Amino acid sequence: MKMTYASALEALSALEALDGENTIIRDGGREQVIRKPYQFSAATRMAIARNLCALQATRDVFTLARNDAIRRISGGKSTVPDDLRDDFASEMADLARQETDVALARVIEADLNLAENRLPPTVLAALLPLVDA
């Protein structure tokens, strides 16, 4: 699937949010936060895992390009000087708009089990490029 690096990173963040929902449990006077896993079929969980791996590799490529830009703009240093931050920001915006081809598994909307899984709309919006109705 062709997508920009920006949309790939957004999809990765959304997929990482599919591990579960934080829930507060009260035991007497004590509160504890636990992560309640979302309920997906085995096939959907595997599609999510495959997509995570593919998008993590894409993030790694983006990170290498980002680090190269930092070194190039800063003259070999690990941080961008204040007077060159605009140049760096412009280069990162250009990089984020570049297209990459990522092998992603499609997910069926019904398999997200939205009646049971309270996925935030922001997560759903980021997942839309991967979801078939």
Where in this protein do the model-derived segments appear?
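N-terminal interaction modules that seed assembly of large macromolecular complexes
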Residues: 2-4, 8-65, 69
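Low-complexity intrinsically disordered segments
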Residues: 56-133
